[in-house]
Amino acid sequence: KTTGLSTGMKQNGAITVASTKERMQELLRQATTAQLSDVEVEVLNKKRLKELYPVLHSEDIVGGVYMPKDAQADPVGVTNVLAKAAKMEGAKIFEKTPVKKILTKNSRIIGVETDKGIINCEYVVMATGMWSRQLGEEINVSVPLYPNEHFYIITEPIKNLPQNLPVLRDYNAC
């Protein structure tokens, strides 16, 4: 449902680069799979990479793929918008209320037991991050989520850096 609330989403696309022939072969397989699902993908040579990402040091890059419709959003902004939209529809949000147990009946969630008592409900949003998988196991629900470490850098503004650069991924550099 459209709420008119902004998530801060920016659709700048995404580039994944390959610095080995093996990684490039993997990217080509992934691009083919994406195209079978009607996802727009462009296979990139070094020249096209520099056009799309002019600040990229591309001497040791074999090639890459570009997905122009990929987007990014601020996770905190998305969380706040989802919470506000849910409240607009009558949902109640309980912060700082640890759940001890998810209550079920006939394979359906009927509520949660917290340290403040039982909360009966028709729906539960498990916003428990990396603990969601463990919580799901307790009620025989598979949550295909695994902890994964990500790296990013924070810098001062970089002069003349285009503001609409695609997200850049280099799995060989991590």
Please describe what each predicted stretch is.
Residues E22-Q25, Y53-I61, L103-I110:
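A short, glycine/Asx- and small/polar-enriched loop/turn
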Residues Q30, V55-L56, E138-I139:
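Residue-level signal for well-ordered alpha-helical positions
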Residues G64-Y123, A127-W131:
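Helical element adjacent to the flavin cofactor pocket in flavoenzyme catalytic cores
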Residues K1-L52, A173-C174:
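Dinucleotide-binding Rossmann-like beta1-alpha1 core, especially the glycine-rich loop
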Residues I102-C174:
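Flavin-dependent oxidoreductases
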Residues A14-A18, G64-Y66, Y152:
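Short aromatic/hydrophobic contact patches that present stacked aromatics
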